[in-house]
Regions:
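Conserved ABC transporter NBD signature motif
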Residues: 59-71
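Helical segment within the ABC ATPase nucleotide-binding domain
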Residues: 187-200
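ABC ATPase "signature
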Residues: 229-233
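The feature captures the beta-strand-to-loop junction immediately N-terminal to the Walker
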Residues: 36-38
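A short, proline-enriched helix->beta-strand linker immediately N-terminal to the Walker B motif
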Residues: 166-170
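A short, surface-exposed alpha-helical micro-motif characterized by mixed small hydrophobic
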Residues: 214-216
Length: 267
């Protein structure tokens, strides 16, 4: 079976300086990969490269990123844009910053949906309100009529998650999707993302500091330090019996936090 996503010996540079070195990973339909590591380790850079969002300063200088057998690195911008939404969607760490401040949430959701499917504004609103309810946004009608600056950071985060989920992408890339949410809402979001995988076979890459989220969701884990892969394997193996010294140190620090009742599952 051909993998949905495959990175082969990928090196990424910003302004000529390597920030990710020789990374490889593979993801099949319905699989979830957790990417963990300290801040600045290159976690977010990898998913930005998959989306073609490295900006003018960033570039994949070595290796290939294959999506359904096509090399994303070689794609023209127009071809890549066709993938974004119905094929590949992203939840940003700060979804509020990705929303337009002078347009209502409803307008922005409708625009993102109609780019990829024929849908009426009414149907779009109904689907959005249902999705919002599932991830803890109870007053969906009011949210649709609001501007992003009228909502809290946690509410904007859930709006971003809602937009991504509504498009039922084959691949969902999530950068700290639960970081701005309280524990109860985190649980709802995680459960809804797992339901997406069950119903639609959605594959996911979850970038997070929260080891509890990885433990709950991920089939595989990739551990990064200074842009290099330190460990990559099945979740149970990496979390409970890591081989790399850095991973052992990371997991032991998480265990200490759990025992003392501080932290947020490794965050």
């Amino acid at each position: 079976m051909e993998s949905l996503l495959k990175l082969e010996h990928v090196t990424i540079c910003y302004n000529g300086e390597p920030v990710v070195h020789d990374v490889g990973l593979e993801l099949n339909k319905g699989e979830i990969l957790g990417v963990v590591g300290e801040s600045g380790s290159g976690k977010s850079t990898i998913i930005k490269a998959i989306m073609g969002l490295l900006g003018n300063e960033g570039m994949v200088t070595e290796g290939d990123i294959w999506y359904k057998g096509k090399n994303v690195v070689d794609m023209q911008e127009k071809e890549l844009r066709r993938l974004l939404g119905p094929e590949i969607a992203m939840v940003f760490q700060n979804s509020g910053s990705a929303l337009c401040p002078i347009r209502t949430v409803g307008d922005q959701i409708y625009e993102s949906m109609r780019e990829h499917e024929r849908i009426s504004r009414k149907e779009c609103a109904e689907r959005a309100v249902r999705m919002m309810a599932k991830i803890g946004l109870k007053d969906g009608e009011r949210v649709l009529q609001s501007y992003p600056f009228e909502l809290s950071g946690g509410m904007n985060q859930r709006v971003g998650i809602c937009i991504s989920m509504l498009q039922n992408p084959a691949l969902l890339l999530a950068d700290e999707p639960t970081s701005a949410l309280d524990v109860t809402i985190q649980k709802q979001v995680v459960e809804e993302m797992l339901l997406m995988r069950k119903e639609y076979g959605t594959a996911m890459i979850i970038v997070t500091h929260n080891i509890g989220v990885v433990e709950k969701m991920a089939d595989k884990v990739l551990v990064l330090k200074n842009g290099k892969v330190r460990e990559y394997g099945k979740t149970a193996q990496v979390l409970t019996a890591p081989e790399d010294p850095y991973t052992k140190e990371l997991m032991s620090s998480v265990l200490r936090l759990k025992r003392t009742g501080t932290g947020n599952g490794g965050r």
